[in-house]
């Protein structure tokens, strides 16, 4: 038997319904904040992610589905969504239009990592990217948007924020951090030694416990912030507080990607076992220029849909749609034609077999239908149909010409 690949799962109807509910909520909130949908390819040039995500990241170093296609091109399945959206922004010359552009996306991402609860090799993200707006108010709006999504989904989270500063802040901080790492070179892991050379700040993202113990004494990035970066970070906290959003400052929060500056944030949930990030993002003012575009501000976030699904469990069991059936074989053609007309306006399940009433009712219940419609010999003679609301249990016989009015 051929099965799905390890770390890649089917979404059967109940899970697919939950996925759709989550995405619908995300889209509704994003649109309220002025975001429009963008669709980008699943397959991109590998160079895109090497330049955007960074050579020192685990994604590029260990996790990409990378291969050479039949044309000899070095390509990979997208491991995250931001880089593709930025590429599309540049390719469409929107970086030269001097306008603010807000986009949202959702879909499959791919990383070759060890599958575990809430973490798959093919997984789904919902994300938003804003280009051309450098105000810290936009950073706050992004965070408020994510907070609103989780509120609507009734998911409890902890928000952690940090500032990575601007270019001058980062230069000053890296000098202090490298000095600290050199002093502890014999104690840190090999990955951290590699990161020290490529992008020192990423050592703070190391998951090895012995390294984390060492980094408790590392210099704090917020002590190296320029006046401008410090003012922006203070303003961000002020806006969040004014809007009733609680947060914790985590000076070790650097995200896993190399292109962030100033604001970085994560929403953490402990509802799927150990504390786990369910959404994260921040500002990346250098990324558009890194990828060959005209320098442009950027800020955004992404959230893991599977992790949200783990928290919410199965989709709600709200009844929906119409179940239409006949008690006699002679009337199956009639209900089929009736159902075909109703499908222009309603969700209709048609039973092609004549069965006893109780059997039909059982089938309708199993399919979670809201409205049960049945035609028997007597109803046909009188040009009527038997109607039952399976939610309220109300039932009656109604004239066929009044059916659509009853269905609403």
From Swiss-Prot:
The keyword Zinc does not apply. Belongs to the class-II aminoacyl-tRNA synthetase family. The keyword tRNA-binding does not apply. One of its GO terms (cellular component) is cytoplasm. This is Histidine--tRNA ligase. It comes from Campylobacter concisus (strain 13826). It comes from the Bacteria. It is found in: Cytoplasm. It catalyses: tRNA(His) + L-histidine + ATP = L-histidyl-tRNA(His) + AMP + diphosphate + H(+). Homodimer. GO terms for biological process: histidyl-tRNA aminoacylation. Its main location: cytoplasm. One of its GO terms (molecular function) is ATP binding. Keywords: Aminoacyl-tRNA synthetase, ATP-binding, Cytoplasm, Ligase, Nucleotide-binding, Protein biosynthesis. Its EC number is 6.1.1.21.
């Amino acid at each position: 038997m051929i099965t799905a690949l390890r770390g890649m799962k089917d979404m059967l109807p109940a899970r697919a319904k939950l996925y759709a509910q989550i995405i619908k909520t995300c889209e509704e909130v994003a649109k309220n904040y002025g975001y429009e949908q963008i669709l980008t390819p699943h397959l991109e040039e590998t160079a895109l992610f090497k330049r955007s995500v960074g050579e020192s990241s685990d994604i590029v170093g260990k996790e990409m589905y990378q291969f050479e296609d039949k044309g000899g091109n070095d390509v990979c399945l997208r491991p995250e969504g931001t880089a593709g959206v930025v590429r599309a922004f540049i390719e469409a010359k929107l970086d030269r239009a001097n306008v603010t552009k807000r986009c949202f996306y959702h879909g499959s991402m791919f990383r070759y990592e060890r599958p575990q609860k809430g973490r798959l090799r093919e997984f789904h993200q919902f994300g938003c990217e804003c280009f051309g707006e450098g105000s810290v108010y936009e950073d706050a709006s992004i965070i408020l948007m994510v907070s609103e999504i989780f509120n609507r989904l009734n998911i409890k989270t902890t928000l952690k924020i940090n500032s990575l500063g601007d270019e001058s802040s980062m230069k000053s901080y890296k000098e202090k951090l490298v000095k600290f790492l050199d002093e502890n070179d014999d104690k840190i892991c090999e990955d951290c030694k590699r990161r020290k050379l490529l992008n020192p700040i990423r050592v703070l993202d190391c998951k090895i416990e012995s390294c984390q113990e060492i980094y408790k004494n590392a210099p704090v990035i917020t002590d190296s912030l320029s006046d401008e970066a410090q003012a922006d970070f203070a303003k961000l906290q002020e806006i969040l507080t004014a809007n009733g959003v609680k947060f914790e400052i985590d000076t070790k929060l650097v995200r896993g990607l190399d292109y962030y500056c100033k604001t970085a944030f994560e929403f953490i949930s402990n509802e799927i076992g150990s504390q786990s990030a369910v959404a994260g993002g921040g500002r990346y003012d250098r990324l558009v220029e890194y990828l060959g575009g005209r320098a442009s501000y950027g800020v955004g976030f992404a959230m893991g849909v599977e992790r949200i699904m783990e928290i919410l469990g199965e989709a709600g069991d709200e009844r929906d749609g119409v179940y239409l059936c006949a008690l006699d074989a002679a009337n199956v053609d009639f209900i089929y034609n009736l159902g075909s007309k109703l499908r222009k306006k309603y969700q209709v399940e048609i039973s092609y077999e004549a069965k006893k009433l109780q059997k039909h009712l059982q089938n309708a219940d199993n399919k979670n239908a809201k409205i049960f419609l049945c035609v028997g010999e007597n109803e046909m003679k009188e040009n009527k149909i038997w109607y039952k609301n399976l939610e309220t249990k109300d039932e009656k016989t109604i004239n066929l010409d009044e059916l659509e009015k009853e269905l609403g």
